[in-house]
Amino acid sequence: MQVFLDNPKAFFETVSGWVWGPVMLMLLVGTGILLTVLLKGLQFTMLGYALKQAFVPPKKHKSGEGHEGDISHFAALMTALSATIGTGNIAGVATAVVTGGPGAVFWMWMTAIFGMATKYGEGVLAVKYRVNNSKGEMSGGPMYYIEKGLGKNWKWMALAFALFGTFASFGIGSSVQSNSVAQAVQTSFGIEPAYTGITLTVLTAVVVLGGIKGIAKAASFIVPAMAVFYVLGGLSIIAINSDALMPAVKLIFSDAFSAQAVAGGAIGTVIRYGVARGVFSNEAGMGSAPIAAAAAKTDHPVRQALVSMTGTFLDTIVVCSITGIVLVMGLLGAGGEFVKPEVSGAALTTVTFQKMLPGIGGWIVTIGLIFFAYSTILGWCYYGEKCAVYVFGEKFAGLYRVGYVSSVMLGTVLSLDLVWLASDTFNGLMALPNLIALLLMAKVIVNETRDFKQKITNGELPH
């Protein structure tokens, strides 16, 4: 305790380094690989079907009519993506490329491929073990499937997850995101952070005070719009600079397994940063997304789990790939070699987009960053509230929302190095109990999957 009081930053640096060390990364990827094997590559064989479940309108696809839940499959996916697609898609990918090299993009893809199985497993358990609260709303997520699926003896682990999730929401969910918006607005428009903070706080309060339905409604509009805007902007840059595309893709694959990296021991760095940033971006295994999945109207846990699985695909395989490929294209030297930049994070992404598309390239990143961060604030409010209510009770919900909205304002005017470190630590601590639960309940996930396929075959459920 004294170490923490004397130097809290050093304390969290040490703890975060341990939490997100090789063991955690192996556990995250290993869980995904195990579920992929047990589910016979479901993320490959059923991806098309899963995307259809997510995006076909309810009036044409009746899976959500007359079933328990608060919001549609699509709204649940957009709520999860609102929290998932954030500054990590812009700043996180840039950090991975600078620190781990172009090959880190390849390992980010690998993390997403196996992470889809993890996200699927989370979704199955979230819907299967969800409960109705006193307001008639659905509540679910790791804290519920740990307690109900593993038994009362595991209640301590459920409480630990929920407590860590509550703390994490005030950092990575609100303060860090609002700080990113304030900096971006000040850089691009010269507006003081305090004014941005007031505006962002009001916009957040208006939405989150309406609960999950308000958040889902906002997310269902913001997320598709911002994702399409950013992806189209990135694709335009790739098309305009198409001569650099193949050299960049070739470099991504060659650097992932380069003899030089293997011989020098750098291959571990390439893999570590690719895996770590991929996990931070798509949150597969962290246990956050299943909290939103539990609110979906569905006739079977597997149907919503398939929709949840597409979130990892859209976040990393689509959005992060755009950032990664444009960055590598922009950092190619005259001889096709990778030129390590002097800047990193969101600044590097902004500079590179501007270089590749003069005039508006930087604006694509700035506008994308603003909306990505704002949507993350909305999504994480729901996650944090559900965690807080599990620990402290339903009466705490109103107090939590007030505190969360206040942290949005604080984030725009404070230095957040410590908050970043603390949030990273709590996110990792969330993942540990969740991954343990997934491994212990892998058989449940497999059995539910078999049951769904059988009912589809027998005509008991709509296809």
Residue ranges and their predicted role:
Residues 120-129, 134, 233-251, 259, ...:
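Extracellular/periplasmic helix-exit of transmembrane alpha-helices
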Residues 1-83, 87, 97-104, 115, ...:
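N-terminal alpha-helical transmembrane segments of multi-pass membrane transport
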Residues 217-220, 226-289, 294:
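Membrane-embedded translocation segments of transport machinery
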Residues 7-8, 38-43, 88-93, 169-182, ...:
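Transmembrane helix-loop junctions in multi-pass membrane proteins
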Residues 61-98, 125-143, 147-149, 160-163, ...:
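Alpha-helical membrane segments and immediately flanking helix-loop junctions
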Residues 35-36, 111-136, 143, 147-179, ...:
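Helix-loop-helix module between adjacent transmembrane segments
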Residues 27-34, 38-51, 161, 178-185, ...:
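Membrane-interface loop-to-helix entry segments
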Residues 42-71, 95-105, 109, 117-152, ...:
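Flexible loop linkers connecting adjacent transmembrane helices
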